[in-house]
Regions:
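Short, compositionally biased leader-like segments
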Residues: 1-19, 127-144
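Residue-level signal for inorganic ion chemistry
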Residues: 20, 38, 89, 129, ...
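Zn2+-dependent cytidine deaminase-like catalytic core
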Residues: 40-144, 231, 257
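Short, structured interface segments
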Residues: 139-156
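Short, basic/aromatic recognition patches
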Residues: 12-32, 155
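Short acidic/polar active-site loop segments enriched in Thr and Asp
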Residues: 108, 304, 309
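Short loop/turn microsegments at loop-to-beta-strand junctions
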Residues: 35-37, 52, 163-165
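Active-site ligand-binding patch in enzyme domains
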Residues: 154-158, 162-171, 175-304, 313
Length: 316
């Protein structure tokens, strides 16, 4: 009977953790420098489990998901279970540690998915909970959580963002026709998927060749998600991007970063800066922007996921 009971509880834990992971996707790409985390507060008063509080990391990274969920649950959090997609924080920052908040609210059981590699947290969040007498169950749907949090985990461990290359090829292995601007290769379903990838990324990166050839805006165009456009990054060692480019036209709405090398015309750079364009001065290697160093710079800016949509030179 005990084994059956454990099996039932494991199924319940997986079901609510899956729901918490779906919730955490809501603000992917909008919570830097923090990851987008989902939290559910679930209690069972004898009639079956019921969600009494939910939270996702707010835009900008604060408040944390746990605080939002506890605020929604109120007194119903006492004696309840919290499902968290990432180990609760254990350090004092702009807000008190979420591990303490969960324990102080009377949560009696915490089910976690991914462990936090941040040395300020790593294992300490769960230790605080256990010391307070809270039952802790770790690594429920950990593989799924790690995949969703890959950008944050990679940035924490390797000091660089997760990089995803989007590349469309024709049946003969071509990505476009030189001098003919944008060429449509993919179908509607693939284009919509790319829009979702953009909406969940911290930044989109292209080379100056693509910027000059296609004059893209690199914004999210799915209805209802237009405000989810991530920062745009252009690899432009010599600052050849025209001030009339679409990327510059809407810089007041969507950030634009240009990675340049040394020796850029200061007056031309100042003109872009007056428009609101931000510059990343980075090293060059063999005449091109040094990507490893640039990735470190982007991670330092809090970017955890970068979608590369450049052409053959950048992709290579």
């Amino acid at each position: 009977m005990a084994a059956a009971s454990n099996s039932v509880q494991e199924a319940i834990d997986r079901r609510y953790m899956a729901a918490a992971l779906r919730l955490s996707r809501k603000n992917l790409g909008r919570t830097a420098t923090n990851p987008s985390v989902g939290t559910l507060i679930v209690r069972d008063d004898g009639a079956g489990p019921m969600i009494v509080g939910s939270g996702v990391t707010a835009i900008g990274g604060r408040p944390h998901a746990e605080a939002e969920a506890l605020a929604g649950a109120g007194e119903l959090a006492r004696g309840a279970t919290a499902y968290v997609t990432l180990e609760p924080c254990a350090h004092h920052g702009r807000t008190p540690p979420c591990a303490h908040a969960l324990a102080n609210a009377g949560i009696t059981r915490v089910v976690g998915a991914a462990s936090d590699p941040d040395p300020r947290v790593s294992g300490k969040g769960y230790a605080i909970l256990r010391a307070a007498g809270v039952e802790v169950v770790e690594k429920v749907l950990a593989e799924e959580a790690n995949a969703q949090l890959a950008g944050y985990l990679i940035r924490s461990l390797s000091k660089r963002p997760e990089v995803t290359l989007k590349l469309a090829l024709s049946s003969d292995g071509k990505i476009g026709r030189r001098g003919q601007g944008q060429v449509t290769i993919t179908g509607e379903i693939a284009r919509r998927e790319v829009q979702m990838m953009r909406a969940e990324a911290d930044a989109i990166l292209i080379g100056i060749g693509t910027a000059l050839e296609d004059d893209p805006a690199l914004t999210v165009r799915l209805p209802g998600l237009e405000n989810r456009s991530p920062a745009r990054i252009v690899l432009d060692r010599d600052l050849r991007l025209p001030e009339t480019a679409k990327l510059v036209a809407d810089v007041d709405r969507v950030p634009l970063h240009i990675a340049v090398g040394e020796g850029v015309d200061p007056q031309r750079k100042a003109a872009f800066e007056r428009r609101g364009v931000r510059f990343i001065a980075t090293d060059t290697h063999d005449g091109a922007i040094a990507l490893p160093e640039l990735m470190e710079d982007l991670a330092a800016l809090g970017m955890a996921t970068v979608l590369v949509e450049g052409g053959a030179v950048t992709a290579g």
